[in-house]
Amino acid sequence: MYHLKSLARQGARRQQELATLAKALPTAVMQSSRGYATEHQIPDRLKDVPTAKDPRFFDMVEYFFHRGCQIAEESLVDDMKGKLTRDEKKQKVKGILMLMQPCDHIIEIAFPLRRDAGNYEMITGYRAQHSTHKTPTKGGIRFSLDVSRDEVKALSALMTFKCACVDVPFGGAKAGLKINPKEYSEHELEKITRRFTLELAKKGFIGPGVDVPAPDMGTGEREMSWIADTYAKTIGHLDINAHACVTGKPINQGGIHGRVSATGRGVFHGLENFINEANYMSQIGTTPGWGGKTFIVQGFGNVGLHTTRYLTRAGATCIGVIEHDGTLYNPEGIDPKLLEDYKNEHGTIVGYQNAKPYEGENLMFEKCDIFIPAAVEKVITSENANRIQAKIIAEAANGPTTPAADKILIDRNILVIPDLYINAGGVTVSFFEWLKNLNHVSYGRLTFKYERESNYHLLASVQQSIERIINDESVQESLERRFGRVGGRIPVTPSESFQKRISGASEKDIVHSGLDYTMERSARAIMKTAMKYNLGLDLRTAAYVNSIEKIFTTYRDAGLAF
């Protein structure tokens, strides 16, 4: 909750006001935020987060939220409509911002599992719904021994701001089961997943219009298919939209083409929007474009793999891969397809012959243009941020940078592209899959034939127009003088690129186009906000400001029921 205080502004000069308030409220964080004054106070319980070595994950998200509020609050007050005094507007804005902070619902579930060997154990899981300002809520389910109540709350909060950042109309949620999936058989994992689904359903924590899970760490299409099947055959057996209760499903279960690679492709598009901006590249001392760029990726799972593939295709060079059981380094480049094949065959990247194990202290400190943390949270801290040599950090993982490290990186002119934007490709394409399930038809099915015939009619029309013109007598004489040819047919053939698209966009084409557009539009909005508030390279605060303004508008326009 917020610790709100009423602050009277006395005196004629603004700088004197700020100085007085700063002395009176040393922990209130009354700051100018690069020239933009605010009264918003960061709660005392978060006062150590900006310098903490290992803050709680949820505290990190809360702190970034409050930092965004410091920038946005004054503008939100100015934009308030209605016959209210300024003090009344301030109180309303503070009230709505207060409403946006806490986690709305969180459930802890424990149930027994009878293992294949006959012994029993208890399984613990969580589901958090951070914000229901938009429904359904949306967020993945992860299977990991690191799952905790704090982590699930933090990830659900991050999902709220992530969805708002890229204009996906969902609230934020997250779930986790505290298990290591590698220690269970497929039969045991199916029993765990189906039982967890039933427990969520009984408590109203899953449903097409209520709460829609998705894959996350340790889960994939298989688990999502089990969830959809369990829900459809129990609680949702009369619901025609039952399979929209979860996304990331196999294609024949209502999944969508392009979902598996969506997060990695989103990371690529997000990077592309900033790496081609000469203004940002000049600030960090590099040139625009992919040519000659090197990168290191931490984590070679689904996100890391597809990110590496798309960046390599664009012309960048992967020189290092960090995994939990080993690292690879090759300054000449690592082929992501060959490494993927090796990992699929051996279950690890260790032993891959086309790169050497890194012999230094930590590969993430190696010189490169782009560092991509795509594994777990809090890998860049105040203790190692000064050793990062990359010029760009793309947060493909959730929460990889602590607030203290974030400040160090910005002060060092390192461009941090924040998690709530850069890894939003997954939830964006999940939104497309959810819409597909509600519409009960795949994208493009109704238009494929029409688009193909329309394109051929267009080519025929161009050909007829040209032939009609050249058959004119005056044109014939001119053509005969210049080319020695009169009349005849002039075939109009499609170019190679047009020929590939002439039959109309496939579902994957539509998904890729929609994702590209979403990431581009969101990037422009972040840049615009960063410029508006003079935030420089602080893209994280700009992204949070955008999210806060959108969520605030939803609450403001909907009103409070009670």
Swiss-Prot record:
ADP binds at residues 442, 521. CDD domains: NAD_bind_1_Glu_DH. Its main location: mitochondrion. NAD(+) binds at residues 132-134, 167, 243, 436. Keywords: ATP-binding, GTP-binding, Mitochondrion, NAD, Nucleotide-binding, Oxidoreductase, Transit peptide. Subject to allosteric regulation. Activated by ADP. Inhibited by GTP and ATP. SUPFAM superfamilies: Aminoacid dehydrogenase-like, N-terminal domain, NAD(P)-binding Rossmann-fold domains. The keyword Nucleotide-binding applies. Substrate binds at residues 138, 162, 430. Pfam families: ELFV_dehydrog, ELFV_dehydrog_N. It comes from the Eukaryota. GO terms for molecular function: ATP binding; glutamate dehydrogenase (NAD+) activity; glutamate dehydrogenase (NADP+) activity; GTP binding; identical protein binding. ADP can occupy the NADH binding site and activate the enzyme. Homohexamer. Belongs to the Glu/Leu/Phe/Val dehydrogenases family. This is Glutamate dehydrogenase, mitochondrial. It comes from Drosophila melanogaster (Fruit fly).
